[in-house]
Structure formats: structure tokens, C-alpha cells
Design a protein with these regions (language model features):
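Conserved functional hotspots at enzyme active or ligand-binding sites that engage polyanionic ligands
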Residues: 1-126
């Protein structure tokens, strides 16, 4: 079995633009790249060529608090105030990873996980 130890849940990476659809030019820190947060489990990350991620944006419309699917991140590894865009969960091939940025703190990761549960209504009873 092939293992892929280079990406973990909570990591922030720059990925190639073509890894994500609908990228907004103003959200890019490096031209042709976009930051993402890895949200898939480490068990999956170590054994799969794909990662589940959410894009990270510093766009003002993501930071105004009007959309509960945008989670403000308080990570020192981010150069400016940014939000995880939970409404754009996607899976990417790890070949799109460009460079490691850092790791978010445990509270931010918990807030992202909670927002994902709410966004997908994982615990809603019909």
C-alpha cells in the first residue's frame, strides 16, 4: 500500500489554481495559487492520492460575518485575516500541492468542523 505522509488535517497549503473551480483573482496571494485547509482525516490523507480541502479567502465579503459558512481563522501562519470557505468543500489530487504554509490552531479546526456539520446538516433530524 502506498502512503502519503506529507499532508495532515489542519494543514494549510498553497495549491495550483486549476485545483479549485471558481477562484477569485482577489483571493490569490501567489499568482496561480490559492491557499486551502486540509480537512480530510489523517488516516485518509496517509493512504489516498486525494485530499479533501476548503479554500481560504481574505476577501472582505468572506470576513464580514454575514455568512455562517465562512469561518474566520486566527492562525499566525496566515499573513492577513482570512476565512475558511466551508461552502466550497472539494477534493483535490495531491499533485496540486505547491508549498506548505502552516497549521491552524485546534480551536479554529474545531470551528471549521462545526461549520461543516452545520452546512451539510449532518445531525439534522427530519
Amino acid at each position: 500500500m502506498t502512503t502519503y505522509p506529507n499532508a495532515r488535517r489542519g494543514d494549510i497549503w498553497f495549491v495550483t489554481d486549476d485545483a479549485l473551480g471558481g477562484c477569485n483573482e482577489s483571493d490569490r496571494t501567489i499568482r496561480g495559487a490559492r491557499p486551502v485547509l486540509v480537512i480530510s482525516s489523517d488516516g485518509h490523507n496517509f493512504t489516498s492520492p486525494c485530499l479533501t480541502v476548503v479554500p481560504i479567502s481574505s476577501g472582505p465579503h468572506r470576513l464580514d460575518g454575514t455568512d455562517s459558512s465562512n469561518v474566520i481563522l486566527h492562525s499566525a501562519c496566515l499573513e492577513r485575516l482570512s476565512a475558511a470557505v466551508v461552502g466550497q468543500i472539494t477534493t483535490i489530487d495531491r499533485d496540486h500541492l505547491l508549498c506548505f504554509i502552516g497549521v491552524i490552531n485546534a480551536l479554529d479546526l474545531l470551528n471549521v468542523a462545526t461549520a461543516i456539520h452545520c452546512y451539510l446538516e449532518l445531525f439534522k433530524e427530519d
